[in-house]
Amino acid sequence: MFDPSKLSEMLTQFQDKAKEMEEKSHNTSFTAKSGGGLVSVSMSGAGELLDVSIDDSLLEDKESLQILLISAINDVYKSVEENKKSMTLGMLGGMAPFPFGS
């Protein structure tokens, strides 16, 4: 049966796990490439852009550069979001379930 007196303890555990997840995110980086590696973008798990690498051959072709940058940034952002979702589900899965109605 659900014990309301344990709610505070459960919330503290949840907050601790959320803080741990945030720290892991800041220390994780993701990289995406486009144009066969002509453009490479790295982003932290917190969504901070860390690095952009552009092959010299693209410096004369602004339109191609823009397209490849957008593609790489979108790809790395999707990786970061998928990681956040996965970590959140893992965190919630590790929490004790609320046995309401038991």
From Swiss-Prot:
Alphabetically ordered keywords of this record: Cytoplasm, DNA-binding
Chief site of localization: cytoplasm
Assembly description: Homodimer.
HAMAP family: DNA_YbaB_EbfC
Pfam families: YbaB_DNA_bd
Stored PANTHER family: NUCLEOID-ASSOCIATED PROTEIN YBAB
Family to which this protein belongs: Belongs to the YbaB/EbfC family.
Name the UniProt record assigns to this protein: Nucleoid-associated protein WS1681
Molecular function per GO: DNA binding
Protein task: Binds to DNA and alters its conformation. May be involved in regulation of gene expression, nucleoid organization and DNA protection.
Lineage of the species this protein comes from: Bacteria, Pseudomonadati, Campylobacterota, Epsilonproteobacteria, Campylobacterales
GO CC annotations, alphabetized: bacterial nucleoid; cytosol
SUPFAM superfamilies reported in the protein's UniProt record: YbaB-like (SSF82607)
Compartment(s): Cytoplasm, Nucleoid
InterPro entries, A to Z: YbaB-like_sf, YbaB/EbfC
